[in-house]
Regions:
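Cytosolic-biased juxtamembrane loops and peripheral soluble domains of multi-pass membrane proteins
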Residues: 82-108, 126-254
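Hydrophobic alpha-helical transmembrane segments
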Residues: 41-45, 67-72, 110-111, 140-144, ...
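Short, hydrophobic transmembrane alpha-helix segments
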Residues: 53-68
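Alpha-helical transmembrane segments of multipass membrane proteins
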Residues: 52-57, 121-122, 197-201
Length: 254
C-alpha cells in the first residue's frame, strides 16, 4: 500500500514539475515575443513620424502627393514584411532590428547612409515647395514600380538567408548561403538596396534629391570590401564561395 502511494506521489510531483517547466517556457517565449512586438511597433511608428517630419515640414504643407506616395510604398510593404517575420521568423526580425555596428568602417557607412536619406528627403521636400525641378509622371511611376520590386526582392533575400542582419558579423553556426539570388551575386541584398535608394528621390519627384543619393553605391562598395574581409576570416567556406560566384552586386560589371 505504501509502495503504491509512494509511486502515485512521485507521479504527481513529476507532473507538477513538468507543468511548471512548461508554464515557465511558455511564459518566457511570451515575454520574449511581447518585447519584440513592442520594439517593432515603436521603431515602425517612430520611422513614420521621422520620415513624415523630414518630408512635410520642409514642404510647408501636407499637400505633397509624392511624399504620401513614397510613405505608402515604404511603410505598407514594411508593415506586411514585419508581420510575416514576426509570425514566421521572429529571430530574424530581432536581428534586423539590431543596428549596433561594431566595426568602425561599418559605423561610418551607416552614418553616411543616414545622412544621405536625411538630406535627400529634405531637399526633395524643398524642391517641391519652391519648384526647383519637375520629374515627369511616367518617371515617378517607373521609379515606384522599381521601389516595389526592390522591396519584394529584399524580402526574398531575407527568406533565403536566415543569417541576414543589419550589422556586419559572423554569427554562431553561420553557413555560407549559395542558393537563389546568392548563386548570381554574392551580395544580393546590397544590390537590391542600391536600386531601392536610387528610386526614392524620383518617387519624391526631385532631380536635385537624386544627387544626394548618387554616393550611396560608393558607400555600399566600401561596406562590401570590409564585410568580405570579415567573412573570409571568420566564415568557413566563404573563400571557396567567392571563387564560385564571381560577381559582388552586378553580373558582368562588379
Amino acid at each position: 500500500m505504501c509502495g503504491c502511494f509512494s509511486a502515485f506521489h512521485d507521479i504527481i510531483i513529476q507532473y507538477w514539475v513538468n507543468l511548471n517547466e512548461y508554464i515557465y517556457d511558455k511564459g518566457r517565449v511570451f515575454m520574449k515575443k511581447s518585447k519584440l512586438l513592442l520594439n517593432t511597433l515603436v521603431k515602425f511608428f517612430a520611422g513614420i513620424i521621422l520620415v513624415g517630419a523630414l518630408l512635410f515640414l520642409p514642404a510647408g504643407t501636407f499637400h505633397y502627393f509624392n511624399g504620401w506616395l513614397f510613405m505608402a510604398l515604404l511603410f505598407v510593404p514594411m508593415m506586411i514584411l514585419g508581420i510575416v517575420l514576426f509570425l514566421k521568423a521572429p529571430d530574424l526580425l530581432a536581428k534586423r532590428l539590431s543596428s549596433k555596428e561594431k566595426e568602425k568602417t561599418q559605423q561610418g557607412v551607416v552614418k553616411f547612409s543616414a545622412l544621405i536619406c536625411l538630406l535627400g528627403f529634405v531637399i526633395a521636400a524643398l524642391d517641391f515647395r519652391f519648384g526647383w525641378s519637375k520629374v515627369p509622371l511616367w518617371v515617378v511611376i517607373v521609379a515606384s514600380v522599381i521601389l516595389l520590386i526592390s522591396y519584394g526582392l529584399y524580402a526574398e533575400v531575407m527568406r533565403e538567408n536566415a543569417y541576414l542582419s543589419r550589422t556586419v558579423e559572423v554569427q554562431e553556426n553561420q553557413k555560407v548561403v549559395d542558393t537563389g539570388m546568392y548563386k548570381i551575386v554574392r551580395h544580393p541584398m546590397y544590390a537590391v538596396t542600391i536600386w531601392l535608394f536610387l528610386s526614392i528621390p524620383l518617387v519624391l519627384g526631385s532631380w536635385w534629391a537624386l544627387l544626394c543619393f548618387v554616393p550611396y553605391p560608393i558607400l555600399i562598395a566600401v561596406r562590401i570590401k570590409n564585410e568580405e574581409k570579415i567573412l573570409e576570416e571568420g566564415l568557413p567556406g566563404y573563400t571557396e564561395y567567392k571563387q564560385k560566384v564571381r560577381w559582388k552586386i552586378l553580373p558582368f560589371v562588379w
